[in-house]
Swiss-Prot record:
Name of the featured protein: Response regulator protein PilR
Residue positions, PTM 4-aspartylphosphate: D11, D54
Function: Member of the two-component regulatory system PilS/PilR that regulates the expression of multiple genes including the type IV pilus (T4P) major subunit PilA. Thereby, plays a major role in the regulation of multiple motility pathways. Upon appropriate environmental signals, the histidine kinase PilS transfers the phosphoryl group onto PilR. In turn, PilR functions as a transcriptional activator by direct binding to a cis-acting sequence upstream of the pilin gene promoter leading to its activation.
GO molecular function: ATP binding; ATP hydrolysis activity; cis-regulatory region sequence-specific DNA binding; DNA-binding transcription activator activity
Source organism (scientific name): Pseudomonas aeruginosa (strain ATCC 15692 / DSM 22644 / CIP 104116 / JCM 14847 / LMG 12228 / 1C / PRS 101 / PAO1)
Disruption phenotype: Deletion mutant results in changes in swimming, swarming and/or twitching motility associated with virulence in specific hosts.
Highest classification ranks of the organism: Bacteria, Pseudomonadati, Pseudomonadota, Gammaproteobacteria, Pseudomonadales
Primary location: cytoplasm
Binding positions for ATP per the UniProt entry: 163-170, 226-235
Length: 445
């Protein structure tokens, strides 16, 4: 079996020699170029499994080489080597299609990790990625989404996944991880809005025994738990400002220090994040740091809401009903034609999650394994009317009407946060005490 090959592009002989020796010890063959012209000539003569290029070259920019390789040799991952502190340059490289980046002086441990990760990438021309049956839909937006997931899986760039609640952002993050070179390492999801602010630093970075009351033993943080894999920051907009500063530093330095610890520990983690909020608007309102926003939003991936892919609803409904039948051991129910039309005309503010909840209820209520329009109870759902408000003639009692709206909104927040009451209260802009009072008043357990 022939050895894998790496192309090294740098005009400094000392750097070239260091990279050649390190990669040679990893059992890689290397070819070296001093500039863009020589690199192109080598690429035209033979294939490479990896390219390491300096940002500044005598006859051009490393960015030009990244773009050239992306167009002519997309199967070859490229890592950019930049000067220390040149984060803007590194982000430019990632946006251009670079797999990852290193800063000078080159950390050899980090270099070896990067090379090992790059070599685990699947060649897109050698095999086609299997279609994952968890991300259903044949509509143009879903086909485009699956294509983007495949491309982003080959990169180590941070990805900001935007989309409405219930649209499947965590599933998309999980697929990016599973289709990439980190698949054998952990995927660690965390709901940023569900962690109490006083415990946040300990949760993310870990703590040492005795560092605070209740710290009876050393604890590993989320960054270390995700080492070598992916850390998914869900509802990242809910992070308090003080934590945003610490998160930014951890991402930039690729190192964390436990609460009560004296030394930083290097971490190799890919960062994916998501929120149902408009993160750019949060920056404009002063609730989210602009520097962290630019660090997280190297590439944005939008997950379409269900109303933008209505043609996928019958397929989704069929799969959900089959799963419900399998879970209960009962025959699968079928949507009538009228019920399908009702679903396709409904706005689904809660997206796929709302569809799942709606069909689970209808499956329980239907007769003869036939789901009729009335089983869906769309008239009671939040998206049944675009105006969302009843006329005066429909309201018998204002207090009962307002209480019903309050109950629906609280239930929706609880479902979207998987019944985490603290997170649901934050989403509704309530204190936990106020949330607890309303739950008791409305009889919600």
């Amino acid at each position: 079996m022939s050895r894998q090959k790496a192309l090294i592009v740098d005009d400094e002989p000392d750097i070239r020699e260091l990279l050649e020796i390190t990669l040679g010890r990893m059992k890689l063959d290397t070819r070296s170029a001093r500039n863009v012209k020589e690199a192109r000539e080598l690429l035209a003569r033979e294939p490479f499994d990896l390219c390491l290029t300096d940002m500044r070259l005598p006859d051009g920019s490393g960015l030009d080489l990244v773009q050239y390789i992306q167009q002519r040799h997309p199967q070859t991952p490229v890592a950019m080597i930049t000067a220390y502190g040149s984060l803007d340059t590194a982000i430019q490289a990632l946006k251009a299609g670079a797999f990852d980046f290193l800063t000078k002086p080159v950390d050899l441990g980090r270099l070896r990790e990067l090379v090992a990760t790059a070599l685990r990438l699947r060649n897109p021309e050698a095999e086609e990625a299997p279609v994952d049956n968890r991300l259903l839909g044949e509509s143009p937006p879903m086909r485009a989404l699956r294509n983007q997931i495949g491309k982003l899986a080959r990169s180590q760039a941070p990805v900001y996944i935007s989309g409405e609640s219930g649209s499947g952002k965590e599933l998309v993050a999980r697929l990016i991880h599973e289709q990439g070179p980190r698949i054998e390492r952990p995927f660690v999801p965390v709901n940023c809005g569900a962690i109490p602010s006083e415990l946040m630093e300990s949760e993310f970075f870990g703590h040492k025994k005795g560092s605070f009351t209740g710290a009876i033993e050393d604890k590993q943080g989320l960054f270390q738990a995700a080492s070598g894999g992916t850390l998914f920051l869900d509802e990242v907009a809910d992070l308090p400002m003080a934590m945003q500063v610490k998160l930014l530093r951890a991402i930039q330095e690729k190192a964390v220090r436990a609460v009560g610890g004296q030394q930083e520990v290097a971490v190799d983690v890919r960062i994916l994040c998501a929120t149902h909020k408009d993160l750019a608007a949060e920056v404009g309102a002063g609730r989210f740091r602009q520097d962290l926003y630019y660090r997280l939003n190297v590439i944005e991936l939008r997950v379409p809401p269900l109303r933008e892919r209505r043609e996928d609803i019958p397929l989704l409904a069929e799969r959900i009903l089959k799963r419900l039948a399998g879970d209960t051991g009962l025959p699968a129910a079928r949507l009538t034609g009228d019920a399908q039309e009702k679903l396709k005309n409904y706005r689904f503010p809660g997206n796929v999650r709302e569809l799942e909840n709606m069909l689970e209820r209808a499956y329980t209520l239907c007769e003869d394994d036939q789901i009729q329009p009335h089983d869906l109870r769309l008239a009671d759902a939040p998206g049944a009317s675009q105006e969302g408000a009843a006329s005066l003639s429909e309201i018998d009692n204002l207090e009962d009407y307002l209480e019903d709206i309050e109950r629906k909104l609280i239930m929706q927040a609880l479902e979207e946060t998987r019944w985490n009451r603290t997170a649901a209260a934050q989403r509704l802009g309530l204190t936990f005490r106020s949330m607890r009072y309303r739950l008791k008043k409305l009889g919600i357990d």
